[in-house]
């Protein structure tokens, strides 16, 4: 079965954040959205039913289920475990209304192509954060033997049988690496991916594919080897890794409010670059096993330079949240966005709250102010929306965030989590 909201139009929502609230307490980090999405696509090449533990209940995840279900998959949540059985799947044409809204729908191309010999989808959507071409995905699939053409806004892929190849990526794209991995797992022979992405989510997908009975080596390095074959496991259970961006956002929420937080079910190694910048801002961070504790000063120090980079560099998905943090820190901070060319839309909204900065091209120079002032702002994308929430927590008065439904694409009830830590956030439909 698919989730109830499939087919419903998006509802515009606002949230109201009361300012000057310290974030203090203990929270659990949910499963990683960016690990779950490609793994959901990979269930199409499983031999039997799959149980995904720690699977976040997010809009993007539910949209992926609303693509899988019409193709014939059976999907059902039991708590935070998602049960999927794709053995009865027969279709290879993705629902256009959903695939055009969801960038991760592109992950379905590789699995559908290898299973059915064809795949059809629209050009994918997602957050408006710059030009995110899918050419690396398509080039990789063509290197494996796929025939691909564009027709009336559709991507149409066909292949009798994919064959392993050596693929050199022009850029270490996470999505392209994942798509090629899934397609290559079912291809004839070995595929080697050079300049592969190294993100933890790549490692999680590789682990899942290995659990299905395929063989992927080198995940976490820049060279991946995928040995084509067939799935051998009749049933697979996999636990999704913790979401490093959720962890970073919650730590930033405590930091911007001068609070203290303990995070459980977090992987400290995955948030190393984020923790390093929070320490530079004056936070104390301790880690023990799968837990981390952050305590923040009353006012943060400047951060001399944040440059977004592919993993293990600083993640672009934390740039907006750190922009909000720097807006109220002492001194002058600099942020350089190297991954996307249009990811400063949140800056203009923060300016409405009193943030002081100059921006040119991919660089923002932020002069911290002592206080922001609550007002009406807009969430233009998922992470920008999270940044508005953090700014609202630290501001004087109330901050109303419009289009807040975008936040639900990557955070599982963020307002409830923060309210449990001392925030006062309410929803307004």
Label the predicted regions.
Residues 2-429:
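Short, structured segments at the rim of ligand-binding sites
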């Amino acid at each position: 079965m698919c989730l109830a909201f499939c087919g419903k139009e998006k509802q515009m929502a606002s949230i109201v954040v009361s300012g000057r609230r310290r974030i203090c307490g203990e929270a659990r980090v949910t499963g990683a959205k960016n690990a779950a999405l490609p793994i959901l696509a990979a269930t199409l090449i499983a031999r039997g039913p799959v149980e995904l533990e720690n699977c976040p209940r997010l809009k993007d995840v539910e949209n992926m289920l609303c693509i899988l279900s019409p193709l014939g998959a059976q999907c059902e949540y039991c708590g935070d475990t998602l049960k999927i059985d794709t053995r009865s799947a027969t279709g290879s044409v993705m629902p256009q209304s959903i695939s055009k809204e969801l960038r991760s729908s592109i992950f379905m191309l590789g699995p559908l192509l290898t299973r059915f010999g064809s795949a059809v989808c629209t050009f994918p959507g997602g957050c408006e954060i710059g030009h995110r071409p899918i050419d690396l995905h398509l080039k990789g699939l063509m290197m494996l033997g796929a025939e691909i053409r564009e027709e009336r806004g559709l991507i149409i892929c066909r292949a009798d049988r994919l064959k392993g190849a050596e693929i050199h990526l022009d850029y270490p794209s996470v999505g392209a690496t994942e798509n090629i991995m899934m397609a290559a797992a079912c291809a004839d022979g070995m595929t080697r991916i050079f300049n592969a992405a190294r993100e933890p989510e790549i490692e999680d997908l590789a682990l899942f594919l290995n659990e299905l009975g395929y063989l992927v080596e080198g995940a976490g390095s820049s060279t991946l080897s995928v040995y084509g074959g067939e799935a051998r496991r009749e049933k697979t259970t996999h636990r999704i890794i913790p979401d490093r961006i959720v962890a970073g956002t919650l730590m930033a929420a405590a930091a911007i409010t001068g609070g203290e937080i303990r995070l459980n079910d977090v992987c400290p190694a995955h948030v190393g670059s984020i923790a390093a910048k929070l320490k530079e801002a004056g936070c104390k961070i301790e880690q023990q096993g799968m837990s981390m504790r952050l305590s923040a000063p009353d006012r943060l120090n400047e951060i001399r330079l944040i440059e977004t980079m592919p993993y293990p560099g600083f993640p672009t998905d934390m740039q907006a949240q750190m922009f909000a943090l720097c807006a109220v820190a002492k001194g002058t901070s600099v942020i350089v966005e190297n991954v996307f060319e249009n990811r400063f839309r949140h800056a203009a909204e923060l300016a409405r709250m009193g943030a002081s900065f100059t921006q040119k091209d991919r660089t923002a120079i932020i002069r911290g102010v002592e206080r922001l002032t609550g007002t009406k702002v807009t969430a233009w994308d998922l992470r920008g929306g999270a940044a508005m929430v953090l700014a609202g927590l630290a501001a004087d008065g109330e901050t109303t965030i419009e289009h807040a439904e975008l936040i639900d694409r990557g955070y599982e009830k963020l307002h409830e989590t923060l309210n449990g830590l001392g925030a006062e956030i309410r929803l307004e439909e």
